Structure formats: structure tokens, C-alpha cells
A protein has these predicted regions:
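Secretory/periplasmic and organellar redox-cofactor proteins
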Residues: 1-44, 51-146
Length: 146
């Protein structure tokens, strides 16, 4: 069961990284077909990447070494990522004020891409929540095993 959870976590991390790289290299899939518009990640997006990208080697190692204790690391990283992505999403929805200085022309509150309420930080939030839930599930199973 834990191996399936680790594989699910690996798929989530790979999809998140590929999605992140796709948006920064190609941008909106519909606009890119015609104009070649890509998105420059804001500083909050970069911090989200800093929390997401290192999860790939950690999850791969945990999968092959069958090391359940690395779920503490994935849980902590995804927990921090949940707060960061949630904060970023609330800034975009104009619910919170951005207390960080943004680069000119690369404001964190600007919604570059959306489908209804789903924006790039919302996708990041969903990924971190799912990784956190999988990590906690593995940790609960580890505790029951003892």
C-alpha cells in the first residue's frame, strides 16, 4: 500500500514540475499556438518551485529504498508549500495584500492564466495538499506498524 502511495506522490511531483516548466517556457497553451507567449514566474512562484523541485529526488529515493521516514521531509516541504501557494492564491483573489516587494512588470497579484477560479497558484496549492495528504497517510501507516 505504501509503495502505491509513494508512486502516486512521484506522479504528482513529476506532473507539477512539468506543468511549472511548461507554463514558464510556453505559457498559455491556447495563446502559445498563435503568439508564443510565456509567463515569467513571480518571486512567490519561484519559492514554490524551490519547495517542489527537490521533492523529486527525495520521492524517487524513498520509492526505491522503501524509506518511509522521508515522508517527514515531504510532509514538511509540502506543508510549507501549502501555506505559500495558499497565500499567493489569496493575493491573486484580492483577499490579502502582498507584503513582499514584487518586481516591476512581474506582480504576484496579476492573474496570468485562469480557467474560472483555477489559477497557477491554485494548481500549486492542490499539488502540495495532495502530496501532504499522501505523506501523512504514509506516516500514519508507519506509526500503526510500530
Amino acid at each position: 500500500m505504501k509503495n502505491i502511495l509513494r508512486k502516486m506522490m512521484l506522479v504528482l511531483v513529476i506532473c507539477s514540475i512539468c506543468g511549472s516548466l511548461y507554463f514558464s517556457n510556453f505559457g498559455d497553451p491556447m495563446v502559445w499556438l498563435f503568439a508564443g507567449h510565456w509567463f515569467d514566474p513571480c518571486h512567490l512562484c519561484w519559492r514554490g518551485r524551490i519547495l517542489m523541485y527537490p521533492l523529486l529526488p527525495v520521492v524517487i529515493y524513498a520509492l526505491f529504498a522503501k524509506d518511509d521516514h522521508l515522508s517527514f521531509l515531504t510532509a514538511f516541504s509540502s506543508f510549507c508549500g501549502m501555506f505559500l501557494a495558499g497565500y499567493h492564491y489569496l493575493i491573486q483573489q484580492k483577499t490579502l495584500q502582498n507584503v513582499f516587494a514584487c518586481a516591476p512588470g512581474n506582480d504576484c497579484s496579476v492573474v496570468d492564466w485562469h480557467i474560472g477560479f483555477v489559477t497557477i497558484p491554485f494548481l500549486e496549492l492542490v499539488a502540495f495538499v495532495m502530496i501532504f495528504a499522501l505523506s501523512i497517510t504514509i506516516l500514519i501507516q508507519l506509526k500503526r506498524k510500530k
